[in-house]
Structures are given as structure tokens and as C-alpha cells.
């Protein structure tokens, strides 16, 4: 019994000794900075293990920072940074299990069963996909990353304080992204970078769409929180919203900007209480005026993609300078998806398999997708996969509305639900199912949070 009690201390001591040996070795062999870097990384890892909420949000924002980290630290060219965070996330979930607090709530059973069936279809589709290389990579990313991001919130969000703490982490990361983006814009302006044909501002070299998608979610958070404030706090939130809209416009990404407005409108119609609905309409109208003001006030290099929606963009290709319409390309991709789905009876049910969309093009086995989550699932998982996806959405919406009818959503729950709706609309115009896996994360957080709201109200009235 004594030996059993001292085992954790002994293992911890051996672990510290091993870390010291590795630190000294790498500090001598590689660079003296390792003497400081390794202890910091160890402490950061331990901190993340104890805070799976922050780790999960970091995974959601990896599309912004991953490229920069790979460029600065070549080791992450081999070691996937997202996979490393997933391992840390599961270490945090394992810690919860060891403390006896592990468990998936009973109310999640239906949606988790549907999600498991959908994952099974995704896996099986890899055996008949015409694009095995890109297909299996896509399957692996979805089963490892998306599944972890969907299941984790159901485990670690156990009370309202957990949801509030996660919202505070989200605020911190959002503020960091916004400040970094505004500093980058200031640098572009002062260095003469605006005097070109087209500027699509980004952050750390990330895809502007990924940055804009994150900013749209941040805008939804600021809007939902701002209308619940009074006096100067509401005015401050409006100023922050204007800065976020400036950052979104500067990315040149039209889809996330439209998704922000679509998500807020649907949130107002379905979930917002009558107390704040009029305020949300007012803020929405002001936001539209801010966007139009930015489009007329900013340099043409930043607003070109918004002003030339029907004409398309002038780009340099292997065949020379061409004008390409993103909207026309998207519509063509959707048409190809529908035609492929209806091309034969077997395709109608199970279709191409994961990654199969690229088989319609000359490169065949390549990461390519129709930029719409429904058309993507319809083509690659067939009617069966499409029905499973629709059923998942129906179960989630039914539960959201059920809890909404029982009382007003809390501030933190409103943020998560609004973020889910914004990403849902964004998934209809850009990215594939892996690019939009953050949708599953926000959906799980939103469902967990409103369940905690409901349980809290029941405990008060009991």
C-alpha cells in the first residue's frame, strides 16, 4: 500500500530527471536557447493538459498559426502541429478519466450515434474512392481531428463555470488575433503595400479565408455580448465590431463576411430573446452601414474583390493573365457535384468516396472539393451520408429549440450558438469538411452550454 502511494512521486521524480538530461543534451548539441525553451514547453504542455478548453480552442485556430510555426520551427514539417495539440487534448481528457469525472451525458446519445455512423461511412468510403491518396488523408484528418473536436466538449464541460471559463479563453484568443491583424494592416499601410492592384491582408501567412472565418466568429461574439451591455460598454463593443469588420474587409474574403450577417440574422430569428432582438436589429443595421462605409473609404486595392463580384479577379496563370470569377467557379463545382451524384444508381446511394471530387479533374488524386459541405457530402458519401448529416443537424436544432423554449439563453451559450451559425453559413461557400471542422466544435460547445443552462435553471426552481 505504501509503495502504491509513493509510485506517483517516484515516477514524477524520474520524469524530471529525464527532462533535465534531455535539456542539457539538446542545449549542448543544438543551441543554448534549449536550456530555456524546453522547460517553457514542458510547463506549457502541463498547463494545456490541465486546461483542455484552451487546447481545443487552439486546435480550432491552427489554420491561422500552423503555417507560421512550420516556417519558424522546421521540426513541425514532419511533426504535425495539430496532431500534437490533439494528443495534448486527449491527455487532458485522460486526466479527467483518472479523476473519475469522465462520462458522456445521456442527452448526447442520439447525436453521437448519428455522428459515429457518419464517421463509419467516411471510413468505408476510403475503400472505393477513385482518389486514394487524398481520400485517405482526408479520412484520417476527419476521424482524428474532427471527431476529437466534437466529442471533447461533451466530456469537459460539466458546469456553467466551465463554459464561462472557455468563453474567457475565447475572448483572449480573439483579442490576440484582432490586435495582430490590425498591427499587420498598419504595417501594410505604412510600408506602401496598399499601392498595388489587389491586397488580401492575412496573418502569419495564413489563407485569408481562414483568418476571415475566425474574424467572423469573433464579430458574432462581440455582437452578442455587446447588445447585452449598457452605456459606454455597448459603445465600446460597437467600436470593436467596427475594427473587426475592417479586418474582415481587408482580407478580401466575401463569404465569411456574408456568413456573419446570415448567422446573426438566423440567430435573431430562432434563438435571441425578445429583450435583445431590437438591439440586435439596430447593431446589424449599423454593421451594414460600417461595411458600406469601409468599401467606399478604403483604398481600391483592399476593396477590389467586393466591388467586382460579377467580373471576377484578374490573376496570373500558366496560360497568362486571366479573369476568374470565384462565384462562377463555385456554381460550376456545385453543378459537377449534382451531376456526379445523379450519374448512376450506385452513385446515388454511396457515390465517389472521400476525396472523389478531384477525380472529375485532370489531376485526379488531389485535394479538391466543391466548397459546400452539403454538396461535398452528397457527392462523396452519397444520399445515405447526406441523410445522416441532415439528421444530425435536425437533432441538434430540435434540442436547441427545446432548451430555448424553456428559458432565455445565457450570454455564453448565446455566443456559442451564434458562432455555430456563422461557421455553418461559411461552410456553404468555402472549404471542405476538414476546413470547417470548427463547426463541429462550436456545435458541441453550444449544445453542452445550453444543457448546462437548463440544468442550472432546474436546480434553482427545484
Regions found by a protein language model. Name each.
Residues 174, 372, 398-429, 443-445:
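Loop-to-helix entry and N-terminal half of a specific, functionally important transmembrane alpha helix
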Residues 2-96, 121-128:
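N-terminal signal-anchor transmembrane segment
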Residues 2-8, 13-21, 40-45, 116-127, ...:
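Alpha-helical transmembrane segments of multi-pass inner-membrane proteins
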Residues 194-195, 202-204, 318-381:
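Long extracytoplasmic/lumenal interhelical loops at the membrane interface
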Residues 80-87, 110-122, 132-155, 168, ...:
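Aromatic-anchored transmembrane helix interface
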Residues 3-4, 182-188, 250, 271-320, ...:
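A membrane-periplasm/extracellular boundary helix in multi-pass inner-membrane enzymes
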Residues 1-16, 229, 234, 402-413, ...:
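A juxtamembrane structural motif centered on a specific transmembrane helix
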Residues 48-54, 93-113, 164, 225-239, ...:
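Membrane-interface helix-loop-helix junctions at transmembrane boundaries of multi-pass membrane enzymes
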Amino acid at each position: 500500500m505504501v509503495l502504491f502511494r509513493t509510485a506517483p512521486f517516484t515516477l514524477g521524480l524520474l520524469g524530471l530527471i529525464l527532462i533535465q538530461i534531455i535539456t542539457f543534451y539538446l542545449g549542448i548539441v543544438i543551441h543554448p536557447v534549449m536550456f530555456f525553451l524546453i522547460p517553457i514547453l514542458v510547463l506549457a504542455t502541463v498547463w494545456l493538459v490541465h486546461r483542455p478548453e484552451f487546447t481545443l480552442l487552439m486546435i480550432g485556430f491552427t489554420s491561422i498559426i500552423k503555417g507560421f510555426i512550420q516556417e519558424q520551427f522546421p521540426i513541425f514539417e514532419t511533426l504535425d502541429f495539430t496532431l500534437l495539440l490533439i494528443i495534448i487534448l486527449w491527455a487532458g481528457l485522460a486526466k479527467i478519466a483518472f479523476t473519475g469525472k469522465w462520462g458522456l451525458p445521456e442527452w448526447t446519445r442520439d447525436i453521437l450515434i448519428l455522428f459515429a455512423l457518419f464517421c463509419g461511412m467516411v471510413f468505408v468510403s476510403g475503400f472505393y474512392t477513385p482518389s486514394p491518396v487524398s481520400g485517405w488523408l482526408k479520412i484520417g484528418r476527419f476521424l482524428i481531428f474532427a471527431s476529437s473536436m466534437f466529442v471533447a466538449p461533451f466530456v469537459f464541460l460539466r458546469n456553467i463555470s466551465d463554459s464561462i471559463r472557455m468563453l474567457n479563453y475565447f475572448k483572449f484568443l480573439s483579442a490576440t488575433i484582432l490586435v495582430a491583424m490590425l498591427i499587420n494592416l498598419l504595417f501594410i499601410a505604412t510600408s506602401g503595400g496598399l499601392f498595388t492592384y489587389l491586397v488580401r491582408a492575412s496573418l502569419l501567412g495564413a489563407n485569408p479565408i481562414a483568418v476571415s472565418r475566425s474574424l467572423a466568429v469573433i464579430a458574432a461574439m462581440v455582437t452578442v455580448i455587446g447588445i447585452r451591455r449598457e452605456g459606454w460598454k455597448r459603445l465600446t463593443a460597437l467600436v470593436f465590431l467596427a475594427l473587426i469588420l475592417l479586418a474582415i474587409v481587408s482580407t478580401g474574403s466575401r463569404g465569411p463576411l456574408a456568413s456573419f450577417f446570415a448567422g446573426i440574422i438566423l440567430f435573431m430569428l430562432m434563438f435571441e430573446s425578445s429583450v435583445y432582438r431590437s438591439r440586435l436589429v439596430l447593431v446589424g443595421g449599423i454593421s451594414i452601414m460600417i461595411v458600406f462605409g469601409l468599401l467606399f473609404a478604403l483604398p481600391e486595392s483592399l476593396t477590389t474583390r467586393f466591388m467586382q463580384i460579377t467580373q471576377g479577379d484578374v490573376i496570373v496563370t500558366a496560360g497568362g493573365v486571366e479573369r476568374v470569377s470565384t462565384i462562377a467557379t463555385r456554381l460550376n463545382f456545385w453543378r459537377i457535384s449534382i451531376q456526379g451524384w445523379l450519374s448512376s444508381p450506385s452513385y446515388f446511394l454511396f457515390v465517389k468516396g472521400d476525396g472523389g471530387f478531384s477525380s472529375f479533374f485532370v489531376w485526379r488524386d488531389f485535394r479538391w472539393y466543391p466548397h459546400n459541405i452539403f454538396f461535398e457530402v452528397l457527392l462523396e458519401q452519397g444520399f445515405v451520408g447526406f441523410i445522416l448529416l441532415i439528421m444530425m443537424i435536425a437533432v441538434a436544432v430540435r434540442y436547441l429549440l427545446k432548451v430555448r423554449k424553456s428559458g432565455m439563453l445565457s450570454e455564453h451559450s448565446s455566443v456559442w450558438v451564434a458562432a455555430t451559425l456563422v461557421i455553418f453559413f461559411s461552410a456553404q461557400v468555402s472549404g471542405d469538411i476538414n476546413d470547417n471542422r470548427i463547426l463541429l466544435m462550436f456545435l458541441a460547445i453550444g449544445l453542452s452550454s445550453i444543457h448546462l443552462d437548463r440544468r442550472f435553471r432546474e436546480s434553482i426552481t427545484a
